[in-house]
Amino acid sequence: MGKFTPLDFEEYVALARQAAAEGCVLLKNDNEALPLRKGDKVAVFGRIAFHYYKSGLGSGGLVNTKYVVGILDALKEEKDITLDENLLGTYEKWIEENPYDEGQGWGKVPWSQKEMELTDEIVESAKGADAAIVVVGRTAGEDQDN
């Protein structure tokens, strides 16, 4: 075998992050909902905002997620918007009572998570927000895709 040149991991990470950012496409933007405006109050719906899927199962579960930032974490860092803290608190309380189901290993992982029911009261309360973000997700792996 010939000589191997060591790879500069950070160079490839930077390129992968650039490709991911440039690969995001907004397909539809009715009523100019995006970008969010400075001062907007945002209601975030969906338990997956709190427990996002960073990769698939099986071999995909071994993906290095050093640079992964969840949607809710990123929104919390955004200084120009405020989040509907009442709604977040409602989700946090519900999640305490309905913990994330991690399953029991290969082939015994739930393909979706239990979601909080949106009562009329919750929806009415969130109507005070300027925008809503609904986060949905389900997992997939080598033994099943959804």
Identify the role of each PLM range.
Residues M1-N146:
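C-terminal non-catalytic regions of proteins with extracellular/luminal or membrane-system context
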